[in-house]
Amino acid sequence: MMMAQHVLSQGMTRYQPLFGTVLITLALWAIQFVVYAFVPLTMRSHALTYLPSMLLLGMMSAVVPVGADSIEMGFSWYAPILILLVWWLLTRVGRLAQGVEYDKVIGLFSQPMWINALIMSLLIILVAWMGNSNAVLHYRMKIEHALLDGQFDRALKVGKKSLESDADLTMLRMYALARKGTMGEHLFEYPVTANSSQMLPTDSLSVLMMYPADSLYKFLGARPAERMEPMRYLQLLERRDSVINPAVADYQLCGYLIDRQLDKFASAIGRYYTINDSLPRHYREALTLYTHLKSRPVVVYHQTVMDVDYNNLQELEKKYPLFSERKGKVEEQYRGTYWYYYKYQK
């Protein structure tokens, strides 16, 4: 609903959940009232008068995004027509059945009550079937809504325990983390399914549906003059500014980590951070991994706890020669670390 209203109003209005729920409920009830006036079904088939309202509700919740500024229905155009045709036939049968004798029992256990309950259950299933049930899209819309409210902590809690993600969701989480100044500390606690070319909307490979891109660019320092790769955009920002924007620095460093470019990461991190134990966690993990992988590293990083933890990871991997089994065991203990992302998350 939020996405549909934003697109249809071209960003001029925002969907208010409480007001929208009340308004939609009243509108659907009014439709049912009108339908009942023209098709006065009673007793066993009364619930059929709710089908047009429920069908409209399903259509309203079935929209899917197309790019950054348009939507479309997530089902074929003929589906509602076919459903209405079946409904019309059922109403004919229901009108004829009203003249037939029925169970005189009135109340919870009457036959008409249970038949109507069954019909309403089927209508609810119809709405659920028609509606957009894409979990990742719902996460994206909730995060963008939280960003519009300036609630970055709330945005970062959305879908945190889920393994489902996409490039747009990763981009939104990176931005929320950047606003908190914790990208280097928490990014790989989430499933990262993008690469550096998708971590910003500068090249249109990832899109924002509701949150204005201008707000993101203002935070980073400038709007790109043309389409360009995010890393190129960040490098231009760094060259322009005499004082390095910490968010720009973290975006570049995390871009290298996402692409598994440890050499570039190791060469760049010294420009932004003092190499010591106070580095953000994922940067310490990356430098530890880099030091162990390279025979002649440009940066040698050792930290007792981190070295012990990495050695334990290597010992754990040696116990399981089969990749699938090894991945499962490592995931149990190391999911949320850069080490797990680098070696196992594709």
For the regions a language model picked out, list residue spans one by one.
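Membrane-anchoring hydrophobic segments
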Residues: 1-52
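Hydrophobic alpha-helical transmembrane segments
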Residues: 32-42, 61, 65, 126-131
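Soluble catalytic regions of membrane-associated enzymes that act on cell-envelope
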Residues: 131-267
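Solvent-exposed soluble domains appended to multi-pass membrane proteins
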Residues: 220-346
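Membrane-interface helix-boundary motifs at transmembrane edges
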Residues: 35-48, 98-112
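Membrane-embedded alpha-helical segments of integral membrane proteins
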Residues: 47-104
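Alpha-helical transmembrane segments of polytopic membrane proteins
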Residues: 11-28, 73-87, 112-113
